[in-house]
From Swiss-Prot:
This is Probable intron-encoded endonuclease aI3. GO terms for cellular component: mitochondrion. It is found in: Mitochondrion. Encoded within intron 3 of COX1. Keywords: Endonuclease, Hydrolase, Intron homing, Mitochondrion, Nuclease. It comes from Kluyveromyces lactis (strain ATCC 8585 / CBS 2359 / DSM 70799 / NBRC 1267 / NRRL Y-1140 / WM37) (Yeast). The gene is aI3. One of its GO terms (molecular function) is endonuclease activity. Coiled coil: none annotated. Its main location: mitochondrion. It comes from the Eukaryota.
Length: 396
């Protein structure tokens, strides 16, 4: 009976749908954690209620269990197992021994790919360790990722409609799929995967409105993204009131959207001269978009720290050199931002300017240790985490 319960429980967890409609893998950390807990609980129950079998069944090694679970959530754990042994199905043995053997195989199953466990996104809840994160964490991380690699687009559709959408495109690998799936879980959208890229797209108006509200709470920091956001907010509001006017303004100004003065113009323009659009309350509702190219030094530190994780996923590099002169750098074409980060981390190195890109690179052991401590506390979530672990092992 207990074996049937266990099989049903495992089947339920294995096929429990995640937010993207796919299924959770049996070997991700949370599922692994749940299975071990229930197996351990049932095993102890049987041992306590089958005293005749007590001498034939040793309790689970709790210290081994705890250390393994710490390893499953520990960002420093290594993949050290390659065998492909499966859970044994033993016949002619009592239920307690069956449960013990199943649990023992899971506890000692060296065939579980630890690298996969350490780099898989749990379904729903998170065990202690690298993946301990929640809704606000991923919202802040999303803004950093969007600042570094996102895009806000407006497209004309069938000559009489405008389409609005936000996009993040990352290299196609398991870790980047995981991070975008988590963003989808908290912020909606869709995931498209091809041979080279995994792409998160959101294009329905309701969720775009929610993201605009999110950017009010956790503001974009790069100048270009601020101006892209200002353009979509302006055109979208006008589009709701007068479709033809919005299309005309979009076609006229789409190549001028990075000009901060454009949004003052949208506020001050006499709309009665364009398509005879003059609702009495338009100017009251459309207060204009204020663009501040300077970066607010009063940002919440926790926000900036988590934002930086998202930013580094696309604009950071952990460099390993043969001469052991390793370094960490981040870059962008936004001088205001790079100087803000330079001051934020109190880095004295000079900026490098090359091909219209500002680069801040650190070699000194002092700065290397600062960033190791930082990324140990604030954990990277995508493929950059894999690069960081390799880099960290060489530098400690």
């Amino acid at each position: 009976m207990n074996i049937i319960i266990i099989i049903l429980y495992i089947s339920y967890i294995y096929t429990y749908p995640f937010s993207n409609g796919k299924y959770c893998n049996l070997y991700n950390p949370t599922t692994f954690y749940k299975i071990n807990n229930i197996l351990y609980s049932i095993k102890i129950y049987n041992i306590n209620n089958n005293t005749n079998n007590t001498n034939n069944n040793n309790p689970a090694d709790s210290s081994s269990y705890e250390s393994r679970m710490r390893a499953a959530g520990n960002s420093n754990s290594n993949s050290n197992s390659n065998s492909d042994s499966n859970i044994n199905n033993t016949n002619n043995i009592n239920n307690t021994n069956n449960i013990y053997n199943i649990n023992n195989n899971i506890n000692n199953n060296n065939n579980i790919n630890n690298n996969y466990i350490n780099n898989s996104i749990p379904c729903g809840s998170y065990p202690q360790g690298r993946w301990t994160a929640g809704s606000e964490f991923y919202k802040m991380l999303f803004v950093g990722l969007f600042d570094s690699n996102g895009n806000i687009q407006i497209n004309k559709y069938k000559s009489k409609y405008l389409q609005f959408r936000l996009i993040i495109k990352l290299n196609n690998n398991k870790e980047n799929i995981n991070i975008l799936n988590n963003i989808k879980h908290y912020l909606k959208g869709n995931i498209n995967i091809n041979n080279n890229y995994v792409i998160w797209i959101i294009n329905d108006i309701k969720n775009i409105n929610n993201l605009i509200k999110l950017f009010n709470k956790y503001p974009l920091i790069t100048i270009n993204k601020k101006l892209q956001l200002a353009f979509i907010k302006s055109i979208y509001y006008i589009y709701k009131n007068n479709r033809n006017l919005a299309i005309n303004l979009y076609l006229k100004d789409r190549n001028n959207k990075y000009n901060p003065n454009l949004y003052k113009y949208y506020k001050d323009i006499n709309y009665t001269k364009i398509n005879y659009f003059s609702p009495a309350n338009f100017h009251k509702k459309f207060a204009g978009i204020n663009i501040n190219i300077n970066i607010n030094n009063n940002y919440n530190h926790n926000y900036i720290n988590v934002w930086f994780l998202g930013f580094i996923e696309n604009k950071g590099k952990f460099i390993i050199r043969k001469n052991n002169n390793n370094s960490f750098l981040f870059y962008i074409n936004d001088k205001h931002l790079i100087e803000f980060l330079k001051n934020y981390f109190n880095i004295k190195n000079k900026l490098i300017y090359k091909n219209n890109i500002y680069i801040l690179e650190v070699y000194n052991k002092y700065y290397i240790n600062i960033f190791i401590k930082f990324f140990n506390k604030y954990n990277l979530q995508g493929y950059k985490y894999i690069e960081y672990i390799k880099w960290k092992k060489i530098n400690i």
